[in-house]
Structures are given as C-alpha cells and as structure tokens.
Amino acid sequence: MPAIVLIGAQWGDEGKGKATDLLGGRVQWVVRYQGGNNAGHTVVLPTGENFALHLIPSGVLTPGVTNVIGNGVVIDPGVLLNELRGLQDRGVDTAKLLISADAHLLMPYHIAIDKVTERYMGSKKIGTTGRGIGPCYQDKIARIGIRVADVLDPEQLTHKVEAACEFKNQVLVKIYNRKALDPAQVVDALLEQAEGFKHRIADTRLLLNAALEAGETVLLEGSQGTLLDVDHGTYPYVTSSNPTAGGAAVGSGIGPTRIGTVLGILKAYTTRVGSGPFPTELFDEHGEYLSKTGREFGVTTGRRRRCGWFDAVIARYAARVNGITDYFLTKLDVLSSLESVPVCVGYEIDGRRTRDMPMTQRDLCRAKPVYEELPGWWEDISGAREFDDLPAKARDYVLRLEQLAGAPVSCIGVGPGREQTIVRRDVLQDRP
C-alpha cells in the first residue's frame, strides 16, 4: 500500500499534529522524516488531554502504532529522553518507538555555536530557535557529524568527537571568546544518555519498506512547513532541512514511487514565527484577534506568531512543489465572528500583478497582497461534523479557498480536538 506524506503548506504551525492524530488510529506506522526539536506538534485527545511533542512522532499517542524517528532527523539526546520520560509519566506506552541508526545526533557544540552566532549577527540574525539544528545539519553535509549508530561503538565515537571538538573549540574560543568543550566529557555524557535509547536503534529503512510490501500503511510526518524548506522556502529565513514532500523519501529511506498521497495542512489564515517576508501580515486589531483567538504562540519557543490573512499564492506554490493531492484546512473556527474575511489572491510588485510566487526574495519582500473580500459568519462552528452543518458563508469560504489553493479540501478542522473535524473525503480509503 502506498505511503502518505503529511506536510505543512505554509510557514509551519498549521496543525499537523491534529491531522496525524486523526489518521493515527488507521495506520500502522508514523515516521518523522526531518527537523529536530526546533518545531512542535500539539495534539489534543478526546479526553481533553493536551500533548506537546517536539521529536517523537504524534502517532505515539495511538496504541499499536509503530513510530519511527527517521534518518533525516537531528536528535538532541537530552530532549529525546525528557520527552520519553514525560510521555511515560502520563501513562503513554513508548515501547514501539524506533530510531534510525543513520539519524544525526545534536551535540553540545552545535547548541553553543548556534546561540553565539545569532548573538553575533545582531539585527541580521535569521531568528533560529537556538537549539543547534542548523550547525548539526552543517556537520552532516560536511561529513563530520555524529550518527546515532556511533553510540554503539565508543572507540569510534571518541575519535569522531575529538576531531569535531578540535575544530569547534577553535571557533568558540578564538572567534566568539567562549570556553572550550572537553571532548571526554562530551563523550561520557552522550554514552550515559545512550543507555536510555540505544535499544531503540534499528535499520528503519529495511523495516519501513518491508511494512509497505506487507500492505501496511505508513504515514510520513513532516515538521515546519513548505515556506521554511531550505530549497523551496523563503531563503535565508528557513530551516536547515527539507519539510517538503521530496524530503519525506530522503529522510525515511522510502522510495518516491512508494508515496501515493500528499496531504497538505493549511491553516484558514496564515502565521509565521521569526524573521522573513510575510506579505499578508497584519499589524492591526485583526492581527490581534487572530493571535488571541487562535492562541498563536509557538509550541517549542513560546514566541508569539505573526498573523495574517490567508495567502492563496503560497497555497498554490505549496501544491506545486509538493504535488499535494489533498488539503486539510485547520482552524476554520477561529474566523467565526468576523464581518468579512479578506483572502490574498495575488501580489502586486512594482505595479505588476502576479498570481505566482516571486522568483526572488527581493520581489517577495516588496509584494503587496491583492485581496478578495469574502463575507464572514457569526455562528459557532465548533460542533459541526458534516460540511452541510457549516453556515453557508463558511462553506463558501472553504470552496473559494479550494478553487484558489490548487488541490481539494478533503478535511476541515473546526476546533483543536480530534473529533472536531469534518471529513469530506477519506484520504485513507479513497486513495490511488
């Protein structure tokens, strides 16, 4: 059976955790394929319990599902162990969590360099989370990174860490005037942490492909969003990995022909965290309303998210670069009680109108949104479970977004709970 990729179609924080949780009871595997603990998924169970996950796939909250941290993820061992402990303390069974032997480990020098670099950059900083994600991916590309499997060979691990620290300490001490790290202490701390997770290390590529051959369903769960992709996002204000659908194959070891459905998660308005262009950003009472009503604060950083109206240019772009087959529209309920809801249908750049994503960041920074005004609705829609339960104006809003976004809206979120979802098309049953 083909795999399903679940991706964020904006700048992240679209509600991917809710979508994974909704589908989790009907799949056998959930795989996190990129990123690190620089992003978070919030899942609200039918019991009302709220879980914030940063490294572990959202499927861990569904009994019987095997969860995988794939080779494309960078793992902070301390964060992993704390997250596992937090889940276990709340009665969650984590026995079926596996970790790819080829995932990279985030080391103390990655965090140190990330933090001092951001401070050094000052007003020109990217706005990272300061968790060492970028420096860890830099080492991966430079072929000097530490992989999960290295903890199984202490001698090899020691050689690698000593070589890395020799260079990293030069940077920390001579450029940033910080203290040098002791490689022996780094190794000892890592080996101690590894005792808590090394029994989970596996050849996950082999297991995932065997599962697909056996007819099992694999859900590939991305973090962040399309516009934060290092290749396809608003560079340089991006993450250091590929949250797009193409990254799912690379970060899991599943071939692209194994993927049959790409489910894009799309918020009914737009948000982003950190620096970078944001054409529909609001600085008035409407932005304040979206922030407060949508509870737009980062799961990982706690930072307030920037808020703006829905941007169809971005949605079409996401559909194009990901090959999105279906959209899951989230937080439609947040728009209730607005008299009208503007939707960005295009940009104006130096007097020229376009419906497409600008080729350069310079043009995107100068883009002015061209709005189409849609009528709002006042009804509380949080109890709607069928599309026809929605007020006519809310249905019209969804249908207009569907026309503009480049793919059908198959699911609609009308609240944070798993059950607060309208399913127009079953993306698991009605599949290629």
From Swiss-Prot:
Protein name: Adenylosuccinate synthetase
EC number(s) reported in the record: 6.3.4.4
Record-listed substrate binding positions: V299, T300, T301, G302, R303, R304, R305
Presence of the UniProt keyword Zinc in the record: no
Cofactor stoichiometry and binding remark: Binds 1 Mg(2+) ion per subunit.
HAMAP family linked: Adenylosucc_synth
Major enzyme class: ligase
Amino-acid positions noted as binding GTP in the UniProt annotation, renumbered to this chain: 12-18, 40-42, 305, 331-333, 413-415
Catalytic residues identified in the record: D13 (proton acceptor), H41 (proton donor)
Entry annotated with the keyword Acetylation: yes
